[in-house]
From Swiss-Prot:
Protein name per UniProt: Uracil phosphoribosyltransferase
Pathway linked to the protein: Pyrimidine metabolism; UMP biosynthesis via salvage pathway; UMP from uracil: step 1/1
Function: Catalyzes the conversion of uracil and 5-phospho-alpha-D-ribose 1-diphosphate (PRPP) to UMP and diphosphate.
Co-factor note (free text): Binds 1 Mg(2+) ion per subunit. The magnesium is bound as Mg-PRPP.
Reaction catalysed by this enzyme: UMP + diphosphate = 5-phospho-alpha-D-ribose 1-diphosphate + uracil
UniProt cross-references to PANTHER family, sorted A to Z: ADENINE PHOSPHORIBOSYLTRANSFERASE, URACIL PHOSPHORIBOSYLTRANSFERASE, CHLOROPLASTIC
Residues where 5-phospho-alpha-D-ribose 1-diphosphate binds: R79, R104, D131, P132, M133, L134, A135, T136, G137, G138, S139, D200
Designated gene of the protein: upp
Organism lineage: Bacteria, Bacillati, Bacillota, Clostridia, Eubacteriales
EC assignment: 2.4.2.9
Binding residue positions for uracil: I194, G199, D200, A201
Example of a GO biological process term: UMP salvage
Amino acid sequence: MNNVFVMDHPLIQHKISLLRDKNTQTKEFRELVSEISMLMGYEVTRNMPLKEVEIETPVGVARTKVISGKKMGIVPILRAGLGMVDGMLKLLPMAKVGHIGLYRDPETLQPVEYYCKLPCDIAEREIVVLDPMLATGGSASAAIKYLKERGVTSIKLMCLIASLDGIKKINDEHPDVLIYCAAVDDKLNEHGYIIPGLGDAGDRLFGTK
């Protein structure tokens, strides 16, 4: 698998197991998604550029490093991607947040756009697209294409569980985009859901069916 980083940290793997459990209730599910997103955020931001600066401490001067380079942006794919935002903002409180609303047509399994609101300086930012489940890959690919059409040149995709089909679609259509996930499952069912997966992430986050 090209450009795919599967995070095997014990805390992430433990929390993913709890997410998969059908008995995990909405409140705990929501908390787990936020916690996993924050843990994954450490790896997604690992290669952020740094520059040396001098900082005056209470007792002297220290040469240390601060983040430089492009500012960050976070773009959740509505609605399930919203559950990942808070965890990322705990790491990146100054990041701007855009929203892309897509739903999957139940007949064709193709993405349908219904909402988009992005920061005016989106093209100047390094963007992390948030989508808990990379199933067919259609919605994520459409969101990435939408961002590129608006001048974004640096995009990463962060998801909790990815399918092999979804990974292939992103690799084929956006070979420049790095994919970060916590688990890879083999199959999709006839409705486009990842098997074994964790069910409908949006429904489990928001208590809907």
